[in-house]
């Protein structure tokens, strides 16, 4: 529950105060985005590891009907749970690993400012409250594919698809 602190506008000579509730509890948000359509797909997880990543991949493949006739390239970073030989990649999914230390190349990275927006400068009593706010925010983002496409459909994506 590390707080997300952002700058805000205040009157001159006013000191802004943001109450925080420092705790070390974690909640992981996975985001899948199709840059051309702006469609997103989300998972909230209590932690990340290879087993959960395998479950997320399997769910993603099933939800979108991946297989022999429907293929997708999934761009991921080189986190250990993404690149382990124990990762079970479902049929129809191909992982493409980004170079190290290059989050600016990952379209999904552009979504984090949107998901952090409703929790910025807020104090929450429980992880369940944070989870509820994030679920609502993810639903709002899912309803704005044109906006998401504008953020994530980098000009060079079309060149890669050719």
Where is each model-derived feature located?
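Extended, low-complexity cationic-aromatic segments
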Residues: 1-58, 154-155, 160
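RNase H-like polynucleotidyl transferase catalytic core
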Residues: 14-22, 91-110
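Generic structural signal for small/hydrophobic residues in well-ordered secondary structure
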Residues: 31-32, 38, 77, 106, ...
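Short, basic/hydrophobic alpha-helical segments
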Residues: 52-73
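Acidic/histidine-rich, metal-coordinating catalytic segments
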Residues: 68-82, 106
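Carbohydrate transferase catalytic cores enriched for Leloir-type hexosyltransferases
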Residues: 83, 99-102, 128, 134
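Short, aromatic/basic amphipathic alpha-helical patches
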Residues: 84-92
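C-terminal anion-handling pockets and recognition modules
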Residues: 108-162
